Curated annotation (Swiss-Prot):
EC class: transferase
Cofactor(s) essential for the protein: Mg(2+); thiamine diphosphate
Any Pfam family the entry gives: Transketolase_C
Reaction(s) the record says it catalyses: D-glyceraldehyde 3-phosphate + pyruvate + H(+) = 1-deoxy-D-xylulose 5-phosphate + CO2
Cofactor annotation comment: Binds 1 Mg(2+) ion per subunit. Binds 1 thiamine pyrophosphate per subunit.
One of the GO BP terms on file: isopentenyl diphosphate biosynthetic process, methylerythritol 4-phosphate pathway
InterPro entries in alphabetical order: Dxylulose-5-P_synthase (IPR005477), THDP-binding (IPR029061), Transketo_C/PFOR_II (IPR009014), Transketolase-like_Pyr-bd (IPR005475), Transketolase_BS (IPR020826), Transketolase_C (IPR033248), Transketolase_CS (IPR049557)
Family: Belongs to the transketolase family. DXPS subfamily.
Alphabetic keyword roster: Isoprene biosynthesis, Magnesium, Metal-binding, Thiamine biosynthesis, Thiamine pyrophosphate, Transferase
PANTHER family registered for this protein in UniProt: 1-D-DEOXYXYLULOSE 5-PHOSPHATE SYNTHASE-RELATED (PTHR43322), 1-DEOXY-D-XYLULOSE-5-PHOSPHATE SYNTHASE, CHLOROPLASTIC (PTHR43322:SF5)
Protein name: 1-deoxy-D-xylulose-5-phosphate synthase
Pathway(s) it belongs to: Metabolic intermediate biosynthesis; 1-deoxy-D-xylulose 5-phosphate biosynthesis; 1-deoxy-D-xylulose 5-phosphate from D-glyceraldehyde 3-phosphate and pyruvate: step 1/1
GO molecular function: 1-deoxy-D-xylulose-5-phosphate synthase activity; magnesium ion binding; thiamine pyrophosphate binding
Amino acid sequence: MNPSPLLDLIDSPQDLRRLDKKQLPRLAGELRAFLLESVGQTGGHFASNLGAVELTIALHYVYDTPEDKLVWDVGHQSYPHKILTGRKNQMHTMRQYGGLAGFPKRSESEYDAFGVGHSSTSIGAALGMAVADKQLGNNRRSVAIIGDGAMTAGQAFEALNCAGDMDVDLLVVLNDNEMSISPNVGALPKYLASNVVRDMHGLLSTVKAQTGKVLDKIPGAMEFAQKVEHKIKTLAEEAEHAKQSLSLFENFGFRYTGPVDGHNVENLVDVLKDLRSRKGPQLLHVITKKGNGYKLAENDPVKYHAVAKLPKEGAAQMPSEKEPKPVAKPTYTQVFGKWLCDRAAADERLIAITPAMREGSGLVEFEQRFPDRYFDVGIAEQHAVTFAGGLACEGMKPVVAIYSTFLQRAYDQLVHDIALQNLPVLFAVDRAGIVGADGPTHAGLYDLSFLRCIPNMIVAAPSDENECRLLLSTCYQADAPAAVRYPRGTGTGAPVSDGMETVEIGKGIIRREGGKTAFIAFGSMVAPALAVAGKLNATVADMRFVKPIDEELIVRLARSHDRIVTLEENAEQGGAGGAVLEVLAKHGICKPVLLLGVADTVTGHGDPKKLLDDLGLSAEAVERRVRAWLSDRDAAN
């Protein structure tokens, strides 16, 4: 670990505030080096944290946290915040089972004012805190720190619209690095990027580079030039306020300050001290560089948005992509990405839509091959779904590639704009089930429950890679809204067909014939069901569809077996197991049923296998639970 004499003194923001302002740049260097070491060993979100070091230091230096509230949007950039708030010695546990969460978490620290993981919530939450403090007579300050990527979401503008009309002391810090995970899209980033002050800063840098050597040789010339430079910057900022800022943020009722260099920590402190003394809604526009201080991340912030691990020797570079890699099973995301390109090559009506998740959803190749049919709508899940509905109305075949956890954000659009009109939109729902290190904010544990109650909706859950392709092809051709949900990571290693074969909608298959116990399994839980079935001599049904569910198969299994076990990687409440119980009740069948799913609890973060075992859904845990259930029933009889 690199020496960090200043950082070693800090266990809380109170310690930070004892430092002289002139020591803060050195502290920023130490903190950035610590991040390189810690994230290099544990993995995690990387480039965004490197870009937020100086801003985080300045905020905690000026604001009286935890009395004053810092609300981080998304939370990707919260590692420096955690280091400065007493968690430095726990950073080696980041995103690991039982360790620090990868996002701010209220139960983890009093400095984590609001739990996050999804984008664009910070302004609304900070506004709520500011209103509460005003009602209670507290002299606190609330600060929302939001990136320009998150600012593209409608929720952020809803909060701005509301806050600007209120007499509350609220600061919104717009951390503008021209990125979300991928480069930003839409009109707002272009608006911010066209900033006159940015152009002026670039001009000044050029002039300084070309004249600096000459001015150095003239006594007093450099000092005079610096004063002129400062005056030009001031005039440019004032002109910018009049020309652009007044037309957007100030018309929302915010007093605009900026743009400010987000890596000049001393100047940030001065600006924030001034803003803290002001009344009413304020917006500070800060310019930062994602990955700042680490050249590889600066040059490729998408690749370095999150990393697994970095080499130990100074965390100097990522492993070379030219090194030979063992042939691995394809991930479900890769299976989807290949299917999408194959399908698009055969059908010019196919349109792919993603809400700012090009890489994560497997759309990189599609964008390269079919740029005119690729739409990244930004962090705007609601718009993505309604946009797809409009396309479907005119005969196009939209495919919305979206994570399960983010589909929750567009529920009304699913119902109102798609299902009630029975529009044929295909939702490729990635990251269904447990996701691991990102924890409960990113777990896809509710989609079966909230999708199967929607009229007209087809809901499918593949058990392996080949079935994923089959169900994608099947649901794409359906004249109805459909969702195919699949987990993160690799599957079972099943060979994947290159064809476009389909299966009958609403029909499952028997994967194993057994004795008196029937396993009715959905999606990712088919594999553990098969692993256990041989030991318990159980029949295994791969249901494939949650809606329409295969009533005929369920009834046949219930009548030919003494006991039924349902298995799903989804919440038990309202899930696939509940659908099985509804079928049994409808047909007047009374048989013992054990529902195996995720209980009514908030899951943790860490290794997915460990989490599944804790939830009773690993193969070993399923065997234990079923054996105990069978034993209890035998004892009762």
